């Protein structure tokens, strides 16, 4: 869709709840770098159906097909895409007005912790959605 000659990076506001609790719709922003071959754990913007896009984390790669899932989505909710469908790869996020690079220790800690909490995510997300979202606007 885009290539390096067309842009260096692009920033947009996150919409939707699939990357909750760490990226909040309407508040946080993502800074995308041009497409490249993604690694497991990268957050990518990809077209997974015709004209349907998602900003999710790459969780698997098999036989030329990538699988991605939103951090706030159930474990069974995934999307598949091929490399040519990648629009961009996150290089940073702006959370609560502060830039967080994906190479920063803070982001790496978040990513590894969230991966380790996989068996407990459903409970943690339920608590987040039912309690924290109602308390904090």
Regions found by a protein language model. Give the residues of each.
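Extended hydrophobic leader/signal-anchor segments used for secretion and membrane insertion
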Residues: 1-137
């Amino acid at each position: 869709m885009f290539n390096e000659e067309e842009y260096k990076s692009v920033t947009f506001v996150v919409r939707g709840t699939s990357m909750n609790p760490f990226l909040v719709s309407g508040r946080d922003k993502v800074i995308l770098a041009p497409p490249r071959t993604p690694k497991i754990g990268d957050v990518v913007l990809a077209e997974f159906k015709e004209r349907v896009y998602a900003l999710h984390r790459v969780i698997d790669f098999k036989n030329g097909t990538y699988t991605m899932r939103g951090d706030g989505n159930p474990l069974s909710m995934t999307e598949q895409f091929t490399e040519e469908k990648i629009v961009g790869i996150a290089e940073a996020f702006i959370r609560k007005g502060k830039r967080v690079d994906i190479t920063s220790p803070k982001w790496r800690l978040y990513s590894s912790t969230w991966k380790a909490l996989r068996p407990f995510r459903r409970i943690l997300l339920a608590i987040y959605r039912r309690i924290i979202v109602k308390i904090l606007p």
